[in-house]
């Protein structure tokens, strides 16, 4: 049922006319000067800005994903060069049945990437928690020093690692690559976990201690579950950085420790085989599956917390 509101009387000569208007059609003023109205050209400016943003977004996506699209497309090319001659699965057959050295290098990369990422994640996370938890004089200096490997050129880090391992007489090989990758991954883990800890309310730890929890119990039952998304993200980034590293690995590698980047680089003198394009597609699919699995894992953690 609608109620009618009387409109102010309108004078027409000597008579006053009254007109009833439904209250649903009466818009109350939104301010002291009545309802706000956009300028006439405001909608045009917003539409133009929206269109420009879309164009820039498309250009950025093309810049990022066009090389991947080219690599995936030419992995199905029958010819070895850039000239397209037709679809073929020849390079995938060679990848899975005639590329023993490539798979050996790929296995070395996977083993070093996950092992170094695991150790770097544990050390970097504990370091970030310790820096945020305890107060001491050298705290600021340690934070600054932890960022140095991130800003130093990889060539300098690689040469420093080589000199260090030579000084302590450690034979170059898988262990030296593992140690080097762990070293340069720790600062990235420290940075990501520290950013997550900045959002953490440490009064929860005090409440847990008041309820009788020890420091170790508060760490494993309160702190770590709360920052687990940051820990998992830092580990994934460490794996990615270890897989693609070439410069530092080049300095600290030895006989029998060829990784995938080193193997691809050694092929340049003879020409890179299209088998690498096929391997790229396999890696992309593997990383996508890993990312989706971690995304589901992080959602489960967020829902449980």
State where each predicted segment sits.
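Short membrane-interfacial helix/loop motifs at transmembrane-helix boundaries
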Residues: 66-100, 250-255, 305
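Transmembrane-helix boundary motif in ABC transporter permease subunits
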Residues: 41-46, 114-146, 163, 219, ...
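Interhelical loop and adjacent transmembrane-helix boundary motif
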Residues: 43-49, 92-101, 242-295
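Non-cytoplasmic
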Residues: 70-79, 189, 231-265
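C-terminal transmembrane helix and the adjacent membrane-cytosol boundary/short C-terminal tail
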Residues: 4, 8-11, 15-22, 28-37, ...
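Loop-to-helix entry region at the N-terminal start of transmembrane alpha-helices
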Residues: 101-108, 163-186, 230, 235, ...
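Membrane-interfacial helix termini and adjacent extracytoplasmic/periplasmic loops
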Residues: 36-43, 81-82, 89, 138-139, ...
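Transmembrane alpha-helices
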Residues: 55-56, 61-68, 190-194, 200-202, ...
